[in-house]
């Protein structure tokens, strides 16, 4: 009895000691689609495993607003948030305020991730963020409607998309006045930068700024690309698409009110959920190409980083290690169709069963087109704002593509000044 009491006493003492050392971390995570719920599942699993607590904070939906908030917090050296979810184009903008994770996460685990993303997240020789999920724009289509209207495959070119979208739209509107052919991200924000870069690149018009730092956006093929997309609005795409972000587009699509959608892979799992009117009717393909061009998908994706001013850096780094590890990335891939950043998971049977297009579109994900964040450095945000605003003026028909890109070229030259 005395022995049992002694053991019980030690157990209680150990539990009390563990509780005394437990910390509460604050995690600025996702607000898009099922993103917040998936963040909570992962954070709760780590909390249960370690005895710590994770408090999730709601953040702005649009990445531009999120970045502005984070820059304000980090610029003030605030310790309110321990772990940040950051966009793939932010390391150069806020890296100086983030902790070097190379001393907290074993090198072998870091090497399991796509090298290009690890390199992207390395600033001044410091690993300031761990890859969490990668992204590339894809084309969603309704398999049942393509069959209904006599199509055997999704569109390979933007002209084909326009023709197919208009035909299906005309037919479906006889019974559903809300039906539209195509939805995408047409609102003036970072999402439009992603979509427009795909359009221009797929027409052979290059990027906004090339890797050498030269401003290249004002060229005939870029003009042609914007003319083509401008022509979709009011014909194959609704005028309201210029107010759509990712979720607005997904809501139209998931309600069964569009034939095609450009979005990120996360929308697949949401559409396949039980009760969804389009479950079992979703196809995913590479985005269309322009004449003589190749399909292009903008590289997206998010990372996890630790605030350099966190009061609990050890625990925060451990949370990042857990969430970006193979086990959690596999769970997120299977349950929510988030693209892993660990190459071996693209050969995992469970992952491929849940998200078949991870296998068929693997090359799309590994050859995605990067935004010019590295070459433009701290000026990237200004570059992106100017670019999306110019494109938005074209989509809303306030400017013609040629003059809009010529004006943009001048704006970018002023932003560049003597150099990036």
Swiss-Prot record:
Coiled-coil portions: none
A family per Pfam: SBP_bac_1
Signal peptide region: 1-24
Keyword Signal: yes
TM ranges: none
InterPro entries: Bact_solute-bd_prot1, SBP
Keywords: Signal, Transport
Function: Probably part of a binding-protein-dependent transport system.
Family according to the record: Belongs to the bacterial solute-binding protein 1 family.
Name of protein: Probable ABC transporter-binding protein DR_1438
């Amino acid at each position: 009895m005395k022995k049992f009491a002694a053991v019980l006493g030690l157990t209680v003492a150990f539990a009390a000691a563990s509780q005394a050392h437990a910390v509460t971390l604050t995690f600025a995570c996702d607000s898009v689609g099922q993103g917040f719920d998936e963040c909570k599942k992962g954070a709760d699993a780590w909390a249960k495993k370690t005895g710590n607590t994770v408090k999730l904070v709601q953040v702005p939906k649009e990445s531009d607003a999120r970045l502005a908030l984070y820059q304000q917090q980090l610029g003030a050296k605030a310790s309110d948030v321990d772990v940040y979810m950051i966009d793939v184009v932010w390391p150069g903008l806020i890296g100086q305020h983030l902790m070097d994770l190379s001393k907290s996460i074993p090198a072998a685990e870091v090497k399991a991730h796509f090298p290009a993303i690890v390199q992207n997240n390395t600033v001044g020789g410091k690993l300031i963020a761990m890859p969490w999920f990668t992204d590339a724009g894809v084309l969603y289509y309704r398999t049942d409607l393509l069959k209904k209207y006599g199509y055997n495959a999704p569109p390979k070119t933007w002209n084909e998309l326009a023709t197919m979208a208009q035909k299906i739209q005309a037919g479906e509107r006889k019974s559903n006045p809300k039906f539209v052919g195509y939805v995408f991200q047409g609102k003036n924000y970072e999402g439009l930068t992603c979509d427009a870069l795909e359009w221009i690149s797929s027409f052979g018009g290059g990027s906004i700024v090339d890797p050498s730092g030269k401003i290249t956006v004002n060229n005939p093929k870029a003009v042609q690309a914007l003319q083509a997309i401008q022509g979709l609005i009011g014909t194959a795409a609704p005028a309201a698409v210029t107010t759509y972000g990712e979720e607005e587009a997904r809501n139209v699509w998931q309600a069964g009110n569009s034939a095609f959608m450009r979005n990120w892979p996360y929308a697949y799992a949401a559409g396949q959920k039980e009760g969804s009117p389009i479950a079992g009717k979703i196809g995913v393909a590479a985005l269309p190409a322009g004449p003589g061009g190749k399909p292009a998908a903008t590289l997206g994706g998010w990372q996890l980083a630790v605030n350099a001013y966190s009061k609990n850096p050890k625990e925060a780094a451990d949370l990042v290690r857990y969430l970006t590890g193979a086990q959690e990335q596999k769970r997120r891939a299977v349950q929510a169709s988030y693209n892993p950043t660990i190459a071996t998971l693209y050969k995992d049977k469970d992952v491929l069963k849940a998200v078949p297009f991870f296998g068929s579109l693997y090359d799309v994900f590994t050859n995605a087109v990067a935004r010019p964040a590295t070459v433009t450095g701290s000026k990237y945000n200004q570059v992106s704002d100017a670019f999306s605003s110019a494109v938005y003026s074209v989509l809303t028909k306030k400017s013609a593509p040629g003059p809009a890109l010529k004006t943009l070229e001048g704006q970018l030259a002023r932003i560049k000044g003597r150099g990036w």
